[in-house]
Amino acid sequence: MLLRSDTALVTGTGGGIGLAIASALEEEGAKVLRADVKDADLSQPGAAVKLAESAIRSLGQVSIFVHAASPPRRETQTALAVTEAEWRAMLEVNLNSGFLIAQALGRHMREKKIRGRMLFVTSLHADSPRNLPHYSASKAGQTMVMKELARALGPEGIRVNAIAPGAVPGAGFKGAPGLVDKIALGRVATPADIAPMAVAILSEKYGAYMTGATVVVDGGIALYNWIDPLEEA
């Protein structure tokens, strides 16, 4: 097993990609603390640091952190349609909480001399506007946070990377008509398509010399100039 000596905190495990990654880590021998909104509402002030501290207490030490949490969203929203509450919730969960948990666990790993690994689940939306301004901004921010953490923690032997899935139907995203025609492999992804790559990145066997990188797992959708339908809301 690739991760039999590891302990991991994974957010966003109520379903989808977060759940798939948590299950895959467990299959590879890791002891995993799963965190979903019912366990820690990361939209609330102070919740992120409390979750990190709880994970350290529960697991004894944390060697892996995966941030897959993201609040529900409408499928498309223009920049003029997003409400302040939606904007704040998206950035708080995706960006602020991800950074604060990683910061707390990075300090923990450094203090305990743990050669830890962190993984942010970002998105192709981080690189181009798709009528989801709050989501895209949060994912672009995650990418830069990942790179800053990779620079800061690399000398400590701690690796920080990101994985950017393509079209994965789930909460807030059902897939636009004709979307499959714009995917080279001819189908949308499932969480099970993403989890094995996450395991590889987090493992020392396959990812030992990798940090500060974003791995795209999109079935080839980025080969097309795919555009979500504009939907005024």
Predicted segments with their positions:
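Active-site loop of short-chain dehydrogenase/reductase
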Residues: 6, 61-62, 109-123, 155-158, ...
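Conserved Rossmann-fold SDR core element
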Residues: 25, 61, 143-146, 153-168, ...
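A short, exposed helix-loop element centered on a Lys and neighboring polar residues
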Residues: 102-103, 147
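Substrate-binding pocket helix/loop in short-chain dehydrogenase/reductase
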Residues: 75-79, 83-88, 179
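C-terminal substrate-recognition "lid" of short-chain dehydrogenase/reductases
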Residues: 2, 191-217, 222-223
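Conserved glycine-rich cofactor-binding loop
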Residues: 14
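Catalytic loop of short-chain dehydrogenase/reductase
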Residues: 71-72, 110, 117-141, 146-155
